[in-house]
Design a protein with these regions (language model features):
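Active-site-adjacent elements of ketosynthase-type condensing enzymes
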Residues: 133-141
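A short, hydrophobic C-terminal helix/tail in secreted or cell-surface proteins
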Residues: 192-196
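A structural signal for short hydrophobic beta-strand segments in well-ordered beta-sheet cores
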Residues: 143-146
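A short, Trp-centered hydrophobic/proline-enriched beta-strand micro-motif
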Residues: 122-129
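A short core secondary-structure module
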Residues: 151, 155-191
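N-terminal glycine-rich flavin-associated loop
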Residues: 90-109, 135
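Buried hydrophobic positions in well-ordered alpha/beta secondary-structure cores of metabolic enzymes
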Residues: 4, 54, 107, 127, ...
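Amphipathic, small/basic residue-rich leader segments at the start of a protein or domain
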Residues: 1-92, 109, 113-120
Length: 196
């Protein structure tokens, strides 16, 4: 038996034991957060089990809470989840947008601060990209961030901020330098949601 065959058998057994019946059919996906909205008690159990295993973000490094799986192992995980009808336990901008950017560009300290919480669904993230007059043209953003000691003072507007009414935290693009060239001088900034 190859390592991948052994992994498939272990994965199949783990899923059979740990995936609650209600999570083996189509339905809502939890977005996490401090006050998560579970449509069924099994949803909370599934999120906790998959988060503990790192399988909400299976290919992220284990040192940041992810599963540390190779592409081949992740393919097997997805195939075995599909075979029993298991749905993903967590969906969020943290997983889809912020996490990959942090893995690529963040400092070690920033990765350790944010990634484990994303894996476990600890926070519901919203994005602050679009601005009045610029829509999806992110290079034309005008919201400014001015460094003030260890902090930034942010001044500007964001619109169409999906899920801002439910989010615990926001990640947004802000300008830290002059607008020319307009693709330079931008920063991805994370912050507690303004509703805190």
């Amino acid at each position: 038996m190859t390592d991948l065959q052994a992994f498939r058998e272990e994965t199949k057994d783990w899923l059979e034991t740990n995936c609650p019946p209600e999570m083996r059919k189509p339905g809502d996906v939890c977005w996490g957060g401090r006050n998560p909205q579970f449509s069924h008690p099994d949803q909370e159990i599934w999120l906790e089990r998959m988060g503990d295993k790192g399988w909400t973000c299976p290919t992220w490094p284990a040192e940041y809470g992810g599963g540390g799986l190779s592409k081949d192992e992740n393919k097997i995980l997805q195939e075995e989840m599909s075979a029993i009808g298991a749905r993903s336990p967590l969906g969020s901008f943290g997983i889809w947008m912020l996490g990959p950017a942090l893995l690529e560009f963040a400092t070690e300290e920033q990765k350790k601060e944010h990634l484990p919480g994303i894996v476990k669904g600890k926070y519901w993230w919203c994005q602050g990209y679009s601005e009045p007059g610029s829509g999806s043209d992110l290079a034309s953003l005008s919201t400014k961030a001015v460094e003030d000691g260890d902090n930034y003072i942010i001044n500007g507007q964001k619109i169409w901020t999906s899920y801002a009414d439910r989010a615990d935290k926001i990640f947004c693009l802000v300008r830290t330098g002059p607008q020319e060239p307009k693709h330079d001088g931008c920063l991805l900034y994370t912050s507690p949601s303004p509703r805190d």
